[in-house]
Amino acid sequence: MYVLGFLYIHKIYMRLILSCFLLFTILSFGQLNKPISLEFNYLKGNILPHKKGLDHLITGHPEGVMLSVLKQSDGSKEWQKDYNYPEYGAYFLYQDFKNDILGQNYAAGFQSNFYFLKRNIQFKVASGIAMTTHPYDKETNSKNNAFGSKFMANINIGLAYKTYFFNKKIAAQTGFFFSHYSNGRTKSPNSGINTINLNIGLAYNLSTSKINKKDSVVTSIENSKEPIHYNVVVRSGLNESSVVNSGQHSFYHIGFFANKKLNKKTTLQLGTELFLSNFYKDFIKYQSIAYPNKQIDANTDYKRVGVFIGYELFFDKVAVEAQAGYYVYQPFKFDIPIYDRIGIKYYFNKK
């Protein structure tokens, strides 16, 4: 029985271990003069029922492991000191949803760890590409309304308490871990899956370099004297309505916004945008025919106009952007009038 258990674990995690070893080799080769650590976390939790129609997918407690290879910033850039010497690197995540319809997910991407309170509180952000073993299939897996495609985006956020041993060579940590999987409506169905987990983990410092430690996490940030900037943005891509196999259509989102940089870390935004999502044209016609009791006019305008506020957090030339908006013009009221957007931007010019 013990042999069978070992073979089962070996089969599931072999690809994970080999992939992480490759990531470790790429990141750490020739760089052991700087603090490099290998981090392991075990996860177990629950699927969040964030939408209706997911009850049949919640049959157990998902569990998984996350392996990361991380390098601590050395303070060579000013922003690294401002953020208390964060870690950055790569991660590999495996999650078993304990459900025959969902199967398992593998994900890999980039990770950053930020520290507070003498590096005892860790805030983790990781984002990458995920692959599911059980995507939607009309013939073999028609009940999977969460993953309409084999590949999708993966976003992870964690908060943990970390304590150090043996001259900071080894650390133990425990906390909460949130994971999100979605293909961004590029292919239906796409309810996506969110899990909230408890995690326990270990980290091992592979180098002999000391860990940079800031005396205080509170820094004085000088207010920016930059003027208000005005911007035009055009976004485009492909997406699909919630009707399975209805086909992908192009979309064009045209926005105008003003932004004011408050300091070297933060910027506020205020703007408006026009949404031209072409899949809505066919979707409105479909709804008018399929649900005559709703009395939907097939010629209803598919366009939408929104107003939004936004926030940018800068890490040198990279900025994390978050926006929340409200549709002030939405003739076809299928979605709720509130929307949000999260993204990453890179500035080629100096800010």
Residue spans for each PLM region:
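Predominantly the C-terminal beta-signal and adjacent terminal strand-loop region
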Residues: 160-207, 219-225, 335, 339-351
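Outer-membrane beta-barrel translocator/channel fold
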Residues: 36-55, 72, 76-82, 117, ...
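Residues on the lipid-exposed face of transmembrane beta-strands in outer-membrane beta-barrel proteins
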Residues: 40, 67-71, 108-114, 125-129, ...
